[in-house]
Curated annotation (Swiss-Prot):
Binds 1 heme c group covalently per subunit. InterPro entries: Cyt_c-like_dom, Cyt_c-like_dom_sf, Cytochrom_C550, PsbV_cyt_c550. Its main location: membrane. This is Photosystem II extrinsic protein V. It comes from the Bacteria. It is found in: Cellular thylakoid membrane. Belongs to the cytochrome c family. PsbV subfamily. GO terms for molecular function: electron transfer activity; heme binding; metal ion binding. One of the extrinsic, lumenal subunits of photosystem II (PSII). PSII is a light-driven water plastoquinone oxidoreductase, using light energy to abstract electrons from H(2)O, generating a proton gradient subsequently used for ATP formation. The extrinsic proteins stabilize the structure of photosystem II oxygen-evolving complex (OEC), the ion environment of oxygen evolution and protect the OEC against heat-induced inactivation. Low-potential cytochrome c that plays a role in the OEC of PSII. The gene is psbV.
Amino acid sequence: MFSKFFSLQKAFAAARRRLLILILVLGMAGYAWGPALAARQIPPVALSPTESITFTEAQLARGKQLFNRACAQCHVGGQTYPNPDVTLKLSDLEGATPPRDNVLAIVDYIKNPVTYDGVESLVEYHPNTQLLSEYPRLRNLTDEDLKLIAGYILVQAKTVPGWGGTKSESHSDLSAYL
């Protein structure tokens, strides 16, 4: 009887050791893979009509910082306060003439803004890199800075619910934009 009891006790001890080893291995794997699994999946965006690009978290953070400094006065949450009918949501960017749904097209617009239908130049009116006296925030931005801003806009348009939507949609969670 005692030998049976000790055999069961040994079996339980072995099972307990195996369980502890399994828990330890899974815990270490979770610790090692956790940050990668928790990281936001950044979708690729169009660099041009024929090429795509995937920005890193660091690039998007810099793009966000530049956007907030140079663009957010009029484009909080992807809206356009002077003209709420034309926003920074993807469907509006796609519908412009020429389409502004890629990084290089947004960079071109920031440098040489035109009306939504592409007919008239807005260089004299809309903030841009050429309008030196009226809007200095864009003045010293490099092409790389402009690409980061454009990437931030496009990733937001793809991933943030309400980006460029109505006031209640866009402002339901301001933490996504700040």
